[in-house]
Amino acid sequence: MSDEEHHFESKADAGASKTFPQQAGTIRKNGYIVIKGRPCKVVEVSTSKTGKHGHAKCHFVAIDIFNGKKLEDIVPSSHNCDVPHVNRTDYQLIDISEDGFVSLLTESGNTKDDLRLPTDENLLKQVKDGFQEGKDLVVSVMSAMGEEQINAVKDVGTKN
């Protein structure tokens, strides 16, 4: 054995699954679902009755939580669907780099420098304008299935 100590920053979830199974018939509006490999928020669910052949079916209409695209899927209500583990974390904005990355302060006092500015025009303007005006900004970062994106910004006052 060596005398060296190895310190690893926990960035990943130690091989934990990015999704969990849930029966299609139990997924409701405002819940989450994976459609075509994308994490989505359910905006509409309709269930058809059992027909002559087969199961009752659930028709899901959902919006991709990262790119806003509308996706649809039809699944037998007794079957399992993948549901993404969705996390939302607030970070304080420290800096915006020239190449479009943001520097964020985590709760543990470390910096997180691997996130790009948001692609949404309104949100991008809010973040950039607020930062240039010297406001103290807190951004909400949504993460699911290995992707992360800034999806909201809050002004918590001006810097002293």
UniProtKB/Swiss-Prot annotation:
Chain intervals with Basic and acidic residues compositional bias: 1-12
Matching CDD domains: S1_eIF5A
Any GO BP annotation: positive regulation of translational elongation
InterPro entries: IF5A-like, IF5A-like_N, NA-bd_OB-fold, Rib_uL2_dom2, Trans_elong_IF5A_hypusine_site, Transl_elong_IF5A_C, Translation_prot_SH3-like_sf
A Pfam family hit: IF5A-like_N
KW RNA-binding (keyword) present: no
UniProt key word Protein biosynthesis: yes
Hypusine modified-residue sites: 52
PROSITE patterns the UniProt entry points to: IF5A_HYPUSINE
Alphabetized UniProt keyword annotations: Hypusine, Initiation factor, Protein biosynthesis
Post-translational modification (record): Lys-52 undergoes hypusination, a unique post-translational modification that consists in the addition of a butylamino group from spermidine to lysine side chain, leading to the formation of the unusual amino acid hypusine. eIF-5As are the only known proteins to undergo this modification, which is essential for their function.
Region annotated Disordered, chain positions: 1-21
Single GO molecular function: translation initiation factor activity
PANTHER family: TRANSLATION INITIATION FACTOR 5A FAMILY MEMBER
Functional summary from the UniProt entry: Translation factor that promotes translation elongation and termination, particularly upon ribosome stalling at specific amino acid sequence contexts. Binds between the exit (E) and peptidyl (P) site of the ribosome and promotes rescue of stalled ribosome: specifically required for efficient translation of polyproline-containing peptides as well as other motifs that stall the ribosome. Acts as a ribosome quality control (RQC) cofactor by joining the RQC complex to facilitate peptidyl transfer during CAT tailing step.
Family: Belongs to the eIF-5A family.
Protein name: Eukaryotic translation initiation factor 5A-2
Organism field: Solanum lycopersicum (Tomato)
